[in-house]
C-alpha cells in the first residue's frame, strides 16, 4: 500500500505510475479516436479500513472530517460554476456514516446523496475476493443495494484498488446482481496482471463484466472505439476528499489534454452506463487473474478460521431460508463480518521503526513497548470484528454461532479408547488400507478398497507437516521477480530488512513421530500421531519458533470413503523472523491438468491463469479436486484457504506454470508479508481437512 509520504517517485495521486508497464497490452485494442469529445472524471480516495491508524480511528476520521469536507467542496463547486465534485466512496462506509448520523446532520448527508454529491460503489470496500464464497459476494453487494432502495438508485459500477488481482469467481455473482463495470487500481509496487486496460471478463457460463485496469490507483483511460475517456482520480490512502484547488487543477489538466472534450464529474455507475455501449469493441479475457497478495491471509490463522466458520454458517442459514441475502439481518451481520476479508489487516508495520528485535527472545523484550502494543491492538481489533458480527445476530442464531466458534478452540486431543500403535504398520479401515510414515507421521499408504487405487506412497505423502524459515535472499529473489517500482518503501512492505543480521536462513524442517495411537470407534477408526521438531542449533541461535506440541488426528468414518484430518499446534512462541507452517499433500495423481480449484464456488483450472496473475498460490473456498480416467480425489480445507501449488514458499512468484507433481501445500501460517499483516503470532492453532477418494 503506498503512502503519500512514501511515493516520491510516483506521479501525483490519480495519475499512472511513473514506470512503464512490463508489456504493451494495447496492441489488441482498436486505437481510440484522436478526437475525444467526452471525459467523465470520478473522484475518490483510497480506503484502508486501518493502516494509517487503527480501524476505529480511520472510520472516525471519515465520519468526523472527510464526509463533511467532501460535501463542503461539492456545495462550493455547485455554487461557483458548471463543474461539479462527486465523491465516490465505499458503500459500507457511506451506509455506516448515514446510520451514525442523526437529526440535521443526517438530513444534510441525505440531501448530498440526493443531489449526487456523495455516491457509493457497488462493492463495500477493497476486498481480497478469494476469501469470499459466492453467497458472501452477493451479500457484499447487498449493502449497495440497500442504499439503492433507500435512495431509488441502481448502482452498477464498482471499484477496488491496491490488491492487484481478483478471482474470476466474482464475475457471476456481480453480474447477477446488476454490476456492469469493475475498475481495478493496482498497488504501485506490485506486478500488474497482463490484461488490457479495458476488457470484458467472461466466465464459462457466459456472465461478464466490463473491466478497467490501472497501473496505479487510477489513471486516464480512453475507451476503445468511442469518443469517451474516463479519468479516475484517487487521492492516496485515507487522505480524504480533494481540495478545491486540486479539483480545479484536475479539470484544467483534463481540458488541456482533451481540448475538444466536455469534461464532467460522474460516479462509477454513470461511467458504466457511458462505457457499456462500446462493449463489443473490447477484447475478451476468460482466464483467472488471481490475487498475488493472497499469501498474507495466512498471517492470522485464528481470525481466518473463525471467519470461515461464520461464513459457512451464514450460507447454511441463507440456504435454509432463515434469512435472505441482503435483508436487515444479513446487512447487520455483514457490516462486521466483511471486514475480515477487507484488504487491511492492521496498522502500517513500518511505523514500528524497528529492524533489530526479530528473534523470539528479542521480540519478547519489546512486545510491550507502545508501538508494538499499538500494532497488536490493531490486529486484535480485526479479530473483534468477527465477535461483533456474531453479536449482531438474533439470539438463537447468535447462540449457534458462538457454539460453533467455541468448538474451534485447540486442545490436546483425547486418547481415550486408543492404544499404542507402531507407526508404519498397516491399518485396515472400512474404506481404506492405510499406513503412517514412521519418520514424519504423514500418510504414506492410502489404498481405496472400492477401486484398489493407491493414492499415497513414500514419494506421495498426504498430510505432511513442515516448518519453514526464509532468508534475505528469498526476499531478494521475490522482489526481483515481483516488484516493478523502485521505491524506498517497497523493501519494507515486501520484505524484512536486516534479517540476515540475526541468522535468518532458508530452511525447511520436517517433524518426527513422538507417539502413535490407534483404535476402533463406534462409527469408524481413528489414528492419533504426536509430532515434534528438534534442532538444537537453530533453537540455541534463537531463529525458530515452531510449535512445541503438534498432533495429527486422523479419523476414518464408516459412512463414507473419507479421511478427516485435524492438525493441532500448541505452544508456539511469537517470532518476528519470517516463518511459515505447512500441511502438504502430494497424491499419486499423474495428470496435472486433472486438478481444479474451488474459488468463490467456481471451478478454476490452475493452468488457466493470466501472466502477471497468481499462478502459484490461491485461496480456495471449499478445496481442490482431482479427476482422471481411473478415479477422483479431493482435499477439503475448512480453516486454511491459501494453497501453494508446487513450490512450498509463501513468496515464490513466477509466470511459469505450476508443477503439481510437487504437491499442494496449504499455508497454515506465515508472517512473510510486511505492510499491515500480522508480524508475529504465538497462539495455539487447529486446522481441519477432509480427504475423499
Question: What role is predicted for each listed range?
Answer:
Residues 5-26:
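N-terminal export signals
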Residues 327, 331, 339-569, 683-685:
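Catalytic and substrate-binding regions of extracellular carbohydrate-active enzymes
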Amino acid at each position: 500500500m503506498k503512502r503519500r509520504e512514501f511515493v516520491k517517485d510516483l506521479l501525483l495521486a490519480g495519475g499512472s505510475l511513473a514506470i512503464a508497464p512490463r508489456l504493451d497490452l494495447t496492441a489488441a485494442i482498436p486505437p481510440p479516436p484522436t478526437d475525444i469529445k467526452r471525459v467523465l472524471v470520478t473522484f475518490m480516495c483510497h480506503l484502508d479500513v486501518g493502516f494509517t491508524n487503527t480501524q476505529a480511528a480511520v472510520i472516525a476520521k471519515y465520519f468526523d472530517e472527510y464526509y463533511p469536507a467532501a460535501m463542503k467542496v461539492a456545495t462550493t463547486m455547485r455554487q461557483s460554476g458548471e463543474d461539479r465534485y462527486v465523491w465516490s466512496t465505499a458503500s459500507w462506509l457511506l451506509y455506516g456514516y448515514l446510520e451514525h448520523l442523526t437529526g440535521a446532520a443526517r438530513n444534510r448527508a441525505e440531501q448530498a446523496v440526493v443531489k449526487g454529491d456523495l455516491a457509493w460503489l457497488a462493492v463495500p470496500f477493497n476486498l481480497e475476493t478469494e476469501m469470499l464464497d459466492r453467497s458472501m459476494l452477493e451479500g457484499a453487494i447487498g449493502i449497495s443495494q440497500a442504499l439503492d432502495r433507500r435512495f431509488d438508485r441502481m448502482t452498477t459500477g464498482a471499484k477496488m484498488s491496491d490488491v492487484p488481482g481478483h478471482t474470476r469467481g466474482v464475475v457471476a455473482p456481480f453480474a447477477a446482481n446488476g454490476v456492469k463495470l469493475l475498475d481495478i487500481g493496482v498497488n504501485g509496487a506490485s506486478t500488474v496482471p497482463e490484461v488490457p486496460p479495458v476488457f470484458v471478463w467472461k466466465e464459462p457460463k457466459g456472465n461478464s463484466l466490463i473491466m478497467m485496469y490501472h497501473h496505479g490507483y487510477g489513471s486516464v483511460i480512453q475507451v476503445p472505439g468511442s469518443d469517451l475517456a474516463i479519468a479516475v482520480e484517487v487521492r492516496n490512502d485515507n487522505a480524504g476528499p480533494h481540495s478545491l484547488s486540486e479539483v480545479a487543477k484536475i479539470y484544467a489538466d483534463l481540458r488541456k489534454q482533451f481540448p475538444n472534450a466536455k469534461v464532467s464529474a460522474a460516479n462509477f455507475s454513470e461511467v458504466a452506463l457511458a462505457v457499456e455501449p462500446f462493449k463489443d469493441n473490447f477484447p475478451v479475457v476468460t482466464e483467472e487473474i488471481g490475487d498475488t497478495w493472497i499469501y498474507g491471509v495466512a498471517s492470522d490463522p485464528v481470525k481466518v478460521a473463525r471467519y470461515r466458520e461464520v461464513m459457512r454458517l451464514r450460507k447454511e442459514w441463507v440456504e435454509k431460508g432463515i434469512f435472505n441475502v441482503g435483508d436487515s439481518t444479513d446487512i447487520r451481520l455483514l457490516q462486521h463480518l466483511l471486514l475480515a476479508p477487507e484488504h487491511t489487516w492492521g496498522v502500517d508495520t513500518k511505523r514500528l521503526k524497528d529492524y533489530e528485535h526479530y528473534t523470539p527472545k528479542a521480540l519478547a523484550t519489546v512486545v510491550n513497548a507502545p508501538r508494538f502494543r499499538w500494532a497488536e491492538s490493531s490486529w486484535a481489533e480485526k479479530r473483534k470484528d468477527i465477535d461483533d458480527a456474531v453479536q449482531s445476530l438474533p439470539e438463537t442464531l447468535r447462540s449457534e454461532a458462538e457454539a460453533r466458534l467455541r468448538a474451534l478452540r485447540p486442545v490436546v486431543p483425547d486418547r481415550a479408547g486408543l492404544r499404542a500403535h507402531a507407526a508404519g504398520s498397516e491399518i485396515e479401515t472400512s474404506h481404506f488400507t492405510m499406513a503412517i510414515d514412521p519418520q514424519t507421521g504423514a500418510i504414506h499408504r492410502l489404498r481405496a478398497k472400492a477401486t484398489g487405487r493407491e493414492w499415497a506412497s513414500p514419494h506421495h505423502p498426504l498430510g505432511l507437516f513442515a516448518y519453514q524459515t526464509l532468508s534475505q535472499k528469498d526476499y531478494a529473489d521475490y522482489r526481483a521477480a515481483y516488484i516493478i517500482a523502485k521505491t524506498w518503501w517497497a523493501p519494507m512492505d515486501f520484505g524484512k530488512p536486516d534479517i540476515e543480521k540475526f541468522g535468518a536462513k532458508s530452511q525447511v524442517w520436517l517433524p518426527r513421530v513422538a507417539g502413535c495411537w490407534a483404535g476402533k470407534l463406534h462409527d469408524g477408526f481413528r489414528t492419533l500421531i504426536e509430532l515434534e521438531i528438534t534442532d538444537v542449533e537453530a533453537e540455541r541461535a534463537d531463529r525458530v519458533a515452531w510449535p512445541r506440541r503438534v498432533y495429527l488426528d486422523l479419523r476414518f468414518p464408516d459412512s463414507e470413503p473419507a479421511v478427516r484430518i485435524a492438525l493441532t499446534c500448541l505452544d508456539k512462541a511469537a517470532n518476528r523472523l519470517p516463518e511459515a507452517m505447512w500441511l502438504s499433500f502430494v497424491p499419486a495423481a499423474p495428470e496435472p491438468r486433472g486438478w481444479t480449484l474451488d474459488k468463490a464456488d467456481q471451478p478454476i483450472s490452475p493452468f488457466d491463469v493470466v501472466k502477471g496473475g497468481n499462478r502459484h498460490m490461491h485461496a480456495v473456498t471449499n478445496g481442490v479436486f482431482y479427476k482422471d480416467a481411473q478415479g477422483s480425489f479431493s482435499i477439503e480445507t475448512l480453516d486454511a484457504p491459501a494453497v501453494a501449488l508446487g513450490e512450498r514458499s509463501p513468496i515464490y512468484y513466477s509466470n511459469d506454470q505450476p508443477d503439481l507433481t510437487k504437491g499442494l501445500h496449504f499455508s497454515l501460517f506465515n508472517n512473510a508479508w510486511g505492510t499491515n499483516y500480522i508480524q508475529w503470532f504465538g497462539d495455539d492453532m487447529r486446522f481441519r481437512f477432509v480427504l475423499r477418494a
